[in-house]
C-alpha cells in the first residue's frame, strides 16, 4: 500500500464514529436517490429554479455523487475522499440556496433552513479529520498484513 493511500485510510477515530458516518452517509444517499425519483422538485427542476448552470447535466451528476459517496460513507470505504466530494456538494448547496435566503429573509429564517446542511457540513469535516473509525472497510484494509 502506498503511503498516501495508507494515510487516507488510517483512522484513529473512536468506535462510535460509525454512528456519525452512517447517518451522514444515509442522508446523502437518500438525497441523491430523491433527485432521480422527484426530478422536478429535487433534481433538474430544483437546479433550474435556483440558477445552477446546465441543470440537466448537474442534477444527475450531483445525484450520482451523493448516492456513490453516501454509500461509501455508510460502509466506511474511501471515507475521506467521499467526505471531501460531499463537502464540496454541501458547500455549493449552502452558497446557492442559504446565502440568498439570508439576504432575503434574514438570519433566523436562513438558520432554520440550513440546520440539516450545517449538521452534514460539520459531520463531513469530522469524518475528514478523524477517518472512518475502527468499524469500517478502511480500517480492515489498513489492518491487513500486506495493508
Predicted regions and their residues:
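Membrane-interface interhelical connector segments
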Residues: 36-54
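Extended, low-polarity transmembrane helix blocks
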Residues: 1-38, 56-64, 68-71, 75-147
